[in-house]
């Protein structure tokens, strides 16, 4: 299974999505900072499962309909940062879809996630991530879960890694940094947390119009 996660930087990189899906053969596309009203129903054979409705810049998830059936969609509003309160509404920070693999008859959960920006403390982001992981576990007991997105967590990942492992998940970074705007804050912002998946690799794809670089997760259950 191939999953792309991409922060579109205020929808600026939306025009790149067809080519990204075609070039990578992605089965699932998870977006952050997307303008829901401007998203198409289909992107190179991937169907829009859902997008967040209340956010200024929201989340979306696309999947390949000849590979998966979408069974359930859930969004989650997380503890707000000052940034969220000033630039409201920006509350729905996770979008999860429960899918059935048509060929293998197995169910799994994939989620697009966007943590609070760098103006917030790492402690708040850790709380948001923990809440998202708990919600995902409640969506399907014992199912494989993959949450990808912009975690806005470039430094001190040891603390985050310990928390993620304590919750029963694994944290996996890509092979190269995913954010380039600020020299001081360059690093791995976009990565994956998972349980029940074997992550073969996570590749950082070439940069486009966004300040984030898309990542390609190759995983299997």
Give residue ranges: language-model regions:
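Structured beta-strand-rich core segments of catalytic domains in phosphoester-bond hydrolases
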Residues: 28-107, 113, 198, 205-206
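Metal-dependent phosphoester-hydrolase catalytic domains
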Residues: 72-73, 137-143, 151-221
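Structural motif corresponding to alpha-helix initiation and N-cap regions
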Residues: 11-15, 56, 186
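Active-site beta-strand/loop signature of hydrolases that rely on acidic residues for catalysis
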Residues: 3-8, 17-40, 62, 97, ...
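Active-site-proximal segments of metal-dependent phosphoesterases and phosphodiesterases across multiple
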Residues: 114-132, 155-164
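Acidic/histidine-rich helix-loop elements
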Residues: 3-11, 79-89, 119-121
């Amino acid at each position: 299974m191939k999953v792309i996660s991409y922060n579109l930087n205020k929808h600026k990189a939306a025009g790149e999505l067809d080519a990204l899906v075609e070039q990578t053969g992605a089965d699932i596309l998870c977006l952050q900072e997307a303008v829901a009203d401007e998203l198409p129903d289909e992107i190179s054979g991937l169907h829009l499962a859902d997008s967040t409705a209340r956010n200024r810049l929201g989340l979306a998830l696309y999947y390949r309909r000849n590979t998966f059936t979408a069974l359930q969609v859930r969004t989650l509003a997380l503890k707000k940062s000052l940034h969220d309160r000033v630039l409201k509404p920006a509350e729905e920070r996770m979008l999860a879809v429960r899918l059935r693999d048509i060929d293998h008859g197995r169910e799994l959960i994939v989620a697009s996630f966007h943590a609070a920006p760098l103006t917030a403390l790492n402690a708040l982001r850790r709380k948001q991530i923990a809440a998202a992981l708990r919600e995902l576990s409640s969506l399907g007991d014992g199912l494989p879960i993959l949450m990808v997105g912009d975690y806005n967590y470039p430094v001190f990942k040891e603390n985050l890694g310990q928390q993620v492992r304590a919750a029963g998940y694994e944290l996996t970074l890509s092979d190269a940094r995913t954010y380039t705007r600020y020299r001081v804050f360059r690093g791995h912002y976009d990565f994956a947390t998972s349980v029940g998946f074997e992550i073969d690799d996570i590749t950082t794809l070439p940069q486009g119009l966004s300040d984030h670089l898309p990542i390609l997760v190759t995983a299997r259950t």
